[in-house]
């Protein structure tokens, strides 16, 4: 092969290589893989409505006794649960047909938990509970219940017993006196506890009781 032919073959091979490279360079570029779609973000759960709680009080909130203690409990609930609850109260609700009206109004206002804080609300509350299955009722010192109505009480008899022990030790006549409110089971129980406490240290003690038939009736 002559030198001229060799040079021509080298040129042809070089041109072929350049052409091949050019064809590769002009080919369609590979597209990058699309980025994955962001995961859907769940909408925040709606804030639950606060529990509405109502209290029916037999006396004024400033009576310094039974109603005052209940209202302190109501305030403690607000402090403990914050915006999860909304509380309200009606004071000086008589133990009569008016109690049913007040408690029924409370249920109608959307309260889901209602406290009747005196013995005389038992029958009115039972009537309202029967008509409001979606509401929970709590009755103080009573003994009747329903599917959505329960009772609660305090251990006042314990303090009454200790007061009796002190009175039994101090008496010189062996006759003790109790000025009592209304003869309901809770009050009778406290008088009995007082007497038993006194008799535990002085078996000769007797207790005389005077009923005023009022919960709150200052002069």
Ranges and model annotations:
Residues 22-25:
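C-terminal motif of bacterial Sec signal peptides marking the signal peptidase cleavage site
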Residues 1-5:
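N-terminal secretory signal peptides that target proteins for export/translocation
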Residues 36, 40-219:
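A residue-level marker of the well-folded mature domains of exported/periplasmic proteins
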């Amino acid at each position: 092969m002559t030198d001229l032919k060799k040079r021509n073959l080298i040129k042809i091979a070089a041109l072929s290589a350049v052409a091949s490279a050019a064809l590769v360079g002009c080919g369609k570029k590979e597209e990058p893989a699309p980025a994955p779609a962001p995961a859907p973000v769940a909408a925040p759960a709606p804030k639950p409505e606060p529990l509405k709680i109502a209290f029916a009080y037999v006396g004024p909130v400033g009576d310094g006794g039974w109603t005052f203690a209940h209202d302190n409990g109501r305030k403690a609930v607000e402090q403990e649960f914050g915006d999860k609850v909304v509380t309200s109260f009606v004071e000086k609700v008589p133990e009569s047909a008016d109690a049913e009206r007040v408690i029924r109004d409370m249920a109608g206002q959307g309260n889901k938990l209602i406290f009747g804080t005196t013995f005389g609300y038992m029958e009115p509350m039972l009537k309202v509970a029967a008509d409001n299955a979606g509401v929970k009722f709590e009755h103080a010192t009573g003994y009747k219940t329903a599917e959505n109505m329960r009772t609660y009480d305090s251990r006042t008899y314990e303090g009454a017993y200790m007061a009796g022990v002190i009175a039994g030790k101090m008496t010189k006549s062996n006759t003790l006196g109790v000025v009592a409110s209304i003869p309901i089971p809770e009050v009778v129980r406290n008088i009995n506890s007082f007497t038993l406490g006194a008799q535990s240290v002085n078996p000769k003690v007797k207790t005389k009781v005077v009923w005023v038939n009022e919960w709150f009736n200052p002069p």
